């Protein structure tokens, strides 16, 4: 049951969703879905008491969207600022200097000294944006 503080189940499910997006772990997303299913009957009787679980359900219904901004930190700033002009509630945003560490970085190499931005859905990416203006156009 949620109130001003998220429930343990809700917080764990929401964290599992975010980490699942970052690490490409569908099993974590399935566990979050299972948690939401476990409280579905209670949720229908007391919607106001399950705010975090409602966030989980909305997140599960949203397309899996990722934004990878790759390049030297000083070159990424313009892309990060461009992304900040858009409402991206269920988008995992991952800035990085190199393509190491997370599955969403695989195959997305920096372009020399320049930054690139990849807009992806379920880890499938469009061609990279080479300018902040291109990124804004891709984000819609």
Feature map (PLM): residue ranges:
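Glycan-recognition and catalytic cores of secretory/periplasmic carbohydrate-active enzymes
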Residues: 1-140
């Amino acid at each position: 049951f949620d109130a001003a503080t998220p429930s343990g189940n809700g917080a764990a499910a929401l964290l599992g969703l975010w980490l699942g997006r970052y690490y490409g772990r569908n099993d974590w997303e399935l566990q979050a879905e299972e948690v939401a299913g476990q409280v579905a009957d209670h949720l229908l009787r007391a919607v106001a008491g399950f705010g975090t679980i409602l966030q989980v359900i909305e997140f599960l219904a949203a397309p899996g969207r990722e934004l990878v901004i790759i390049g030297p930190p000083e070159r990424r700033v313009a892309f990060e600022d461009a992304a900040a002009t858009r409402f991206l509630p269920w988008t995992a945003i991952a800035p990085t200097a190199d393509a190491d560490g997370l599955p969403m970085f695989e195959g997305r190499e920096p372009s020399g000294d320049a930054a690139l931005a990849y807009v992806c859905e379920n880890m499938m990416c469009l061609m990279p944006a080479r300018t902040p203006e291109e990124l804004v156009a891709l984000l819609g």
